[in-house]
């Protein structure tokens, strides 16, 4: 996976391209499995990371993810520049 855009301009952005890939994959795999309100929170995280929409992130990450769901919250927190935007429902 190699997205053709970069979410930048926010503070403490590290490995942003990989993070956006993880965000897109987690949005597809975690939302139906864990019942998180993922899409709205992902939209906020991507916007905070550089004004990219979840649609762009998901277009760049069409492949299914191999995600360890036990670390889902940690991955989303890291990808969102440590914003705690994902809450259990």
UniProtKB/Swiss-Prot annotation:
Record-linked InterPro entries: Haem_peroxidase_sf, Peroxidases_heam-ligand_BS
Purpose of the protein: Removal of H(2)O(2), oxidation of toxic reductants, biosynthesis and degradation of lignin, suberization, auxin catabolism, response to environmental stresses such as wounding, pathogen attack and oxidative stress. These functions might be dependent on each isozyme/isoform in each plant tissue. Active against p-coumaryl alcohol, coniferyl alcohol and coniferyl aldehyde.
Cofactor(s) listed in the protein's UniProt record: heme b; Ca(2+)
A GO cellular component entry from the record: extracellular region
First-listed, main subcellular location of the protein, grouped into a coarse class: secreted
Protein name: Peroxidase
Enzyme class label: oxidoreductase
Co-factor binding details: Binds 1 heme b (iron(II)-protoporphyrin IX) group per subunit. Binds 2 calcium ions per subunit.
Originating organism: Ginkgo biloba (Ginkgo)
Residues that, per the record, bind heme: 52
Entry keywords, A to Z: Calcium, Heme, Hydrogen peroxide, Iron, Metal-binding, Oxidoreductase, Peroxidase, Secreted
Highest rank taxon of the organism: Eukaryota
Molecular function in Gene Ontology: heme binding; lactoperoxidase activity; metal ion binding
Residues the entry annotates as binding Ca(2+): 53, 68
């Amino acid at each position: 996976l190699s997205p053709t855009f970069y979410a930048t301009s926010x503070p403490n952005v590290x490995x942003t391209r990989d993070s956006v890939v993880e965000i897109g994959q987690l949005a597809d795999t975690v939302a139906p499995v864990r019942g998180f309100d993922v899409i709205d929170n992902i939209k906020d995280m991507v916007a905070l990371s550089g004004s990219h929409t979840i649609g762009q992130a998901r277009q760049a990450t069409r492949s299914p993810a191999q995600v360890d769901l036990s670390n889902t919250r940690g991955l989303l927190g890291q990808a969102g520049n440590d914003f705690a935007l994902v809450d259990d429902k």
